[in-house]
């Protein structure tokens, strides 16, 4: 993409309404614009990051055997009355009436709807286990939305729902999502630690939050320091091998890790002092097993192998992609701007033409741009007339992981400058070497 043809409304001044780093940088980088309190338009740069996050989530969900569908944002209030949760959300739930005076609502979550869908379609244990997921916008009318997309009223959510004949099968489904989440966050360049968590209004008796450590985190968390050195599950993990999946879960839950609500000071104190970690954390995922909490009021049953009816055992598994964008920025930035993990950066490579109009520089940039694009690399080519300092600032602000600086002085020696955003390192290489390094 040529920057001269792209929509990138950069803000050079720090927005006064932004209280935290991610909100400031997302506004300055032209990723989002606020349309009303807690509601944001995702501009092209922000949408590219959001889509890359969603693609990784999809790939890892599909790897487990989960099946994607899409449920509506508007739900019938009758479903929520049937589950008994219609009043639980209070004013957080935005309630509306259609032209026929029927009570409707903007869905804050989808346990009721997915249970109703499965109730009407699954009658036998032979159709289980089943895991259905979707990625959809949700709305919760927060009293005080703040911090940009980190805590907004409208947000994008991946929620998955598992259905099993019994508690044993449901535990395996839970474990599969546990492992999938470890892989998902690792692929995004994040070290997410699973922590025993409170179930809240979702309900159930088993829950883990996946937390990334950040000084700006909203809550205090406590864990063993060895978690930071643990390797994620491999790509070839067999999700059908219940024993192998259970072993991964055991490895990641044996050491102490808990959110503030579930913290046990005595257990934490037993950890060697040099391995104790008390820090701020950001929740990036949350999984629940809640048994028959929803299948019971909906009478969602299947015939078992014994010929008797059995209530379906369920779990739910959430990741907020829009919130995750902000969390990544909170965890990885510097004074110049965003430092994206390579896998989710809006563009992998930036080509900076430092003297537009110079025939040799223009030709070298055009050649690199054509070759890298043909190789499938996401490239942003800054072909604008801005001064060099402004181009450097923009590339660092939006977090381009690799930057190729093409100017007449270095090009006269047959070289371009290759810069790595994460550490600021630079080296002179030939254009051909730059291409070989970055072609993937």
From Swiss-Prot:
PROSITE patterns: AA_TRNA_LIGASE_II. This is Proline--tRNA ligase. It comes from Azorhizobium caulinodans (strain ATCC 43989 / DSM 5975 / JCM 20966 / LMG 6465 / NBRC 14845 / NCIMB 13405 / ORS 571). Keywords: Aminoacyl-tRNA synthetase, ATP-binding, Cytoplasm, Ligase, Nucleotide-binding, Protein biosynthesis. GO terms for biological process: prolyl-tRNA aminoacylation. Belongs to the class-II aminoacyl-tRNA synthetase family. ProS type 2 subfamily. Homodimer. It is found in: Cytoplasm. It catalyses: tRNA(Pro) + L-proline + ATP = L-prolyl-tRNA(Pro) + AMP + diphosphate. It is an enzyme of class 6 (ligase). One of its GO terms (molecular function) is proline-tRNA ligase activity. Its EC number is 6.1.1.15. The gene is proS. Catalyzes the attachment of proline to tRNA(Pro) in a two-step reaction: proline is first activated by ATP to form Pro-AMP and then transferred to the acceptor end of tRNA(Pro). GO terms for cellular component: cytosol. Pfam families: HGTP_anticodon, tRNA-synt_2b. SUPFAM superfamilies: Class II aaRS ABD-related, Class II aaRS and biotin synthetases. Its main location: cytoplasm. It comes from the Bacteria.
